[in-house]
């Protein structure tokens, strides 16, 4: 297994979609995407080598872990490094580099080089020695022996690779093609460090983590850019069944379903949650391990801080919330979109009675609480009275509308 630290835009961004379409592969979803319209098989061959690495510009070239090093240590190092740098802008243009086409900086090169050098030094103790390359200058060979990569320090050259080696006669047409393809997207903010992983030798690299830099002019890290979907509903409405239905059908979309942390056994109920004792929950809550927490019906519920990381990565995050905690949730996630899943009182009563977990008085109390709730004006309402697939397909369509659509032809 090898790791690499790259410049890469968030997966939901237009620049990522354009770059992935150019290469014919999305390294976040780890799947092929359609190449631009009109490309030939020979054109596809020209980008195949770059596609294995995903859309990126190198900061720290691929490295294996040194003995005793761990992926967790790499994550921690990147988080520390990210707090030393603020976001900045990068203006790119199609150009050639050693005979291949690339997007190269017109401005911002010195800031990228500084970031690349810092990444190289910070990760040095975690990287195993790399094999020496051939065909290098004396200085490049010296750098490769010491740092595992020849293009560092004064030899560093920031670029987003577009093709493999080109015949000189083909270069102008490829540069023109790139200028048209990336038109309107050649100024990019550099917002974070992207950790890519090669699971095994020769495998395609995958984007596995984005670590955000400080916001320009601030001492704060970047906050949410994705979309949080806050799902509510009375007991018996079938929330868990509907979320499970949608989860199966939306695999591969830039959308995640957050597990809840709950003080009840893992075997209780139909929800796939993380079971905690009261003491464990209180400890995590006291140490800020939850992005949001609340109490209801004698249980404690929490959403982990990973939710904010997923939002910062530009993902759609679906959480199973509580109507009582909605005001608190809005404070934590101002841009959330609420969804109220419900059913008719008769259906709710029948479902609650069938599961046999509540007494008749408990059922009556739950129905009364549900009847008293008025969804806010910005809340999507979904009625789950009939077959699961009916409301399920409606939910899938609504959630899909919040996901970016991969570019299939340009």
Curated annotation (Swiss-Prot):
Which residues are connected by disulfide bridges in this protein? Answer: none
**Where does the chain bind ATP?**
233-240
Look up the EC number in the record and give it.
2.7.4.23
Output this protein's name.
Answer: Ribose 1,5-bisphosphate phosphokinase PhnN
Q: Which GO terms describe its biological process?
A: 5-phosphoribose 1-diphosphate biosynthetic process; organic phosphonate metabolic process
**Chemical reaction(s) catalysed:** alpha-D-ribose 1,5-bisphosphate + ATP = 5-phospho-alpha-D-ribose 1-diphosphate + ADP
Similarity comment: In the C-terminal section; belongs to the ribose 1,5-bisphosphokinase family.
EC class (word): transferase
Identify the gene encoding this protein.
phnN
**Role summary:** Catalyzes the phosphorylation of ribose 1,5-bisphosphate to 5-phospho-D-ribosyl alpha-1-diphosphate (PRPP).
Record key words, sorted: ATP-binding, Nucleotide-binding, Transferase
Renumbered to this chain, region (Ribose 1,5-bisphosphokinase) spans 221-410
Natural source organism: Laribacter hongkongensis (strain HLHK9)
User: Region unknown: what ranges?
Assistant: 1-220
List, alphabetically, the Pfam families matched: DUF1045
Kindly list the GO molecular function terms attached to this UniProt entry: ATP binding; ribose 1,5-bisphosphate phosphokinase activity
Biological pathway: Metabolic intermediate biosynthesis; 5-phospho-alpha-D-ribose 1-diphosphate biosynthesis; 5-phospho-alpha-D-ribose 1-diphosphate from D-ribose 5-phosphate (route II): step 3/3
């Amino acid at each position: 297994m090898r790791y690499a630290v790259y410049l890469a835009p968030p997966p939901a961004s237009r620049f990522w979609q354009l770059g992935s379409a150019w290469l014919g592969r999305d390294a976040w979803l780890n799947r092929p995407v359609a190449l631009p319209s009109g490309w030939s098989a020979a054109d596809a061959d020209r980008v195949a080598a770059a596609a294995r690495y995903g859309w990126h510009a190198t900061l720290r070239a691929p490295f294996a872990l040194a003995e005793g090093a761990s992926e967790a240590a790499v994550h921690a190092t990147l988080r520390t490094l990210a707090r030393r740098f603020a976001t900045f802008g990068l203006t790119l243009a199609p150009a050639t580099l050693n005979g291949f086409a690339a997007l190269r900086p017109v401005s911002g090169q010195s800031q990228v080089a500084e970031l690349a050098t810092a990444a190289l030094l910070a990760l040095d103790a975690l990287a195993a020695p790399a094999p020496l390359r051939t065909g290098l200058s004396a200085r490049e060979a010296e750098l490769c022996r010491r740092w595992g990569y020849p293009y560092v320090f004064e030899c560093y050259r920031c670029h987003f690779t577009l093709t493999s080696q080109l015949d000189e006669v083909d270069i102008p047409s490829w540069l023109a093609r790139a200028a048209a393809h990336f038109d309107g997207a050649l100024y990019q903010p550099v917002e974070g460090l992207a950790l890519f992983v090669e699971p095994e030798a020769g495998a395609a690299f995958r984007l596995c983590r984005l670590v955000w830099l400080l916001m320009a002019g601030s001492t704060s890290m970047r906050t949410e850019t994705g979309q949080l979907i806050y799902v509510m509903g009375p007991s018996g409405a079938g929330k868990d069944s509907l979320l499970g239905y949608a989860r199966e059908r939306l695999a591969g979309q830039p959308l995640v379903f957050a597990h809840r942390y709950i003080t009840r056994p893992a075997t209780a109920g139909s929800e796939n949650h993380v079971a905690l004792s009261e003491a464990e929950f209180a400890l995590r809550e006291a140490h800020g391990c939850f992005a949001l927490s609340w109490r209801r019906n004698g249980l404690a519920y929490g959403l982990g801080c990973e939710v904010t990381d997923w939002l910062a990565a530009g993902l759609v995050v679906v959480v199973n919330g509580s109507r009582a905690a909605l005001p608190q949730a809005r404070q934590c996630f101002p841009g959330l979109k609420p969804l109220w899943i419900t059913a008719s009182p008769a259906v709710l009563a029948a479902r609650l009675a069938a599961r046999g977990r509540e007494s008749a008085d408990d059922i009556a109390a739950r129905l009364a609480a549900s009847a008293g709730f008025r969804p806010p004006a910005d809340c999507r309402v979904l009625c789950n009275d009939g077959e699961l697939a009916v409301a399920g397909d409606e939910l899938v369509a609504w959630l899909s509308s919040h996901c970016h659509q991969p570019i299939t032809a340009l």
